């Protein structure tokens, strides 16, 4: 029996363009009750990163597969296919790297191997929606002699920051070590430089604050004014807004605001049913605030953006956008007053009206959500960093 353990050194969350580092440990455990044990051998082990794409058949109409592409023996158990047995299709993969060949371990012996690969920047982010799913995995394949291949899959989460794929790593003294006697690995230097560049771009895009005011009106007049200080956010930030109802001419009885994502299938991939079109848009609510606001002149709200959510993106098949969805309940009666008089000549009982004629309307405000530091996401929303399998 051989135990294979794969451990991600920095957690399972990465930014596209970063280098993934994984330590693969192969052990021939010594049974505590065994009186004798024999050595174990593996013919080889290889590792590869791939992105698996799956679409809902009821929502997405995909074109037929290209028959001109060669088939690499998908049914053979001796061919290393990292996506073997998974639903959907592999849309992105890195070149496979061999970890070792002809490994023999004595009882109780263990050996470790380091795997490093740069995550492609041309792929989509990790996403699990109602119409499509993009799932990244690191797959390690091991094989004994004259035996089928055994696959160990390590789930990954990949965040994509648009524009980094067009940036080239500088090869001048600007990124050279400060001391000529200190050597730094090129891959580590490039990885840290890319992380710093991504952090600078995210900070520049989300730190700009400027008050934006929006007049909210229905068909009968002004309801209020909504104010927000910025429209670009990072994962983990709070969306803060204010609502001024004191200037309105239409009484607002209640309002709610929801932080939502809108997943939309591109028109050319929408599933058509007879003469109609299948649902191509789905909404997910991540946070919500509701308030009864009669006689309220000014109020505010704060909606957190979950770290486990996906920033906005767009591919040839689907797009994901963020928005604030408002719903207002207003009174049809002009000058509605539901407070008791200040002076009562004699004792009286005051009750609110049993029925109030109302109107409802909604309003959507688009916002932009960008990724954040992968290290922050790993700490705040931890996922499994270690996977193991027994051969």
Curated annotation (Swiss-Prot):
InterPro entries referenced in this protein's UniProt entry, alphabetically: Rgp1
GO terms of molecular function: guanyl-nucleotide exchange factor activity; small GTPase binding
Coiled coil residues, start to end: none
Name of a matching Pfam family: Rgp1
One GO biological process term: negative regulation of protein catabolic process
Domain of life from the UniProt record: Eukaryota
Keywords attached to this entry: Cytoplasm, Guanine-nucleotide releasing factor, Membrane
Subcellular location per the Swiss-Prot or TrEMBL entry: Cytoplasm, Cytosol; Membrane
Gene Ontology CC entries for this record: cytosol; membrane; plasma membrane; protein-containing complex; Ric1-Rgp1 guanyl-nucleotide exchange factor complex
Keyword Hydrolase attributed: no
Functional note: The RIC1-RGP1 complex acts as a guanine nucleotide exchange factor (GEF), which activates RAB6A by exchanging bound GDP for free GTP and may thereby required for efficient fusion of endosome-derived vesicles with the Golgi compartment. The RIC1-RGP1 complex participates in the recycling of mannose-6-phosphate receptors.
Family: Belongs to the RGP1 family.
Subunit (UniProt): Forms a complex with RIC1; the interaction enhances RAB6A GTPase activity. Interacts with RIC1. Interacts with RAB6A; the interaction is direct with a preference for RAB6A-GDP. Interacts with RAB33B.
Stated name of the protein: RAB6A-GEF complex partner protein 2
Natural source organism: Mus musculus (Mouse)
Gene name for this UniProt entry: Rgp1
């Amino acid at each position: 029996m051989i135990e294979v353990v794969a451990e991600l050194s920095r957690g399972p969350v990465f930014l596209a363009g970063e280098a993934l580092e994984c330590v693969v440990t192969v052990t021939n455990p010594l049974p505590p009750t065994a009186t004798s044990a024999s050595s174990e051998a593996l013919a080889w082990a290889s590792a590869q990163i791939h992105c698996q794409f799956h679409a809902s058949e009821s929502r997405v109409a995909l074109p037929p597969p290209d028959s001109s592409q060669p088939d690499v023996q998908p049914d053979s158990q001796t061919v290393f296919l990292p996506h073997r047995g998974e639903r959907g299709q592999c849309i992105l993969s890195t070149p496979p790297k061999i970890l070792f060949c002809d490994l023999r371990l004595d009882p109780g012996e263990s050996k470790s191997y380091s795997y490093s690969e740069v995550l492609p920047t041309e792929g989509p982010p990790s996403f699990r929606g109602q119409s499509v799913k993009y799932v990244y995995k690191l797959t390690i394949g091991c094989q004994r002699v004259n035996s089928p291949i055994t696959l160990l899959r390590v789930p990954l989460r990949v965040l994509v920051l648009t524009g980094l794929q067009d940036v080239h790593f500088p090869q001048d003294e600007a990124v050279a070590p400060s001391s000529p006697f200190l050597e730094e690995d090129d891959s580590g230097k490039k990885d840290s430089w890319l992380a710093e560049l991504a952090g600078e771009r995210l900070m520049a895009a989300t730190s700009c604050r400027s008050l934006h005011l929006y007049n909210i009106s229905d068909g009968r007049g002004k309801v209020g004014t909504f104010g927000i200080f910025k429209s670009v956010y990072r994962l983990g930030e709070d969306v803060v807004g204010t609502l001024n109802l004191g200037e309105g001419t239409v009484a607002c009885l209640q309002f709610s605001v929801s932080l939502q994502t809108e997943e939309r299938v591109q028109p050319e991939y929408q599933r058509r049913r007879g003469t109609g079109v299948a649902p191509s848009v789905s909404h997910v609510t991540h946070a919500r605030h509701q308030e009864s606001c009669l006689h309220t002149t000014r109020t505010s709200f704060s909606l957190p953006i979950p770290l486990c959510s996906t920033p906005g993106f767009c591919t040839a098949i689907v797009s994901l956008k963020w928005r604030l969805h408002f719903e207002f309940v207003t009174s049809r009666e002009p000058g509605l007053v539901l407070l008791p008089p200040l002076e009562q000549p004699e004792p009286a009982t005051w009750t609110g009206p049993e029925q109030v004629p109302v109107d409802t309307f909604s309003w959507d405000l688009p916002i932009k959500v960008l990724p954040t530091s992968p290290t922050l996401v790993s700490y705040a929303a931890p996922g499994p960093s270690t996977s193991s399998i027994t051969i």
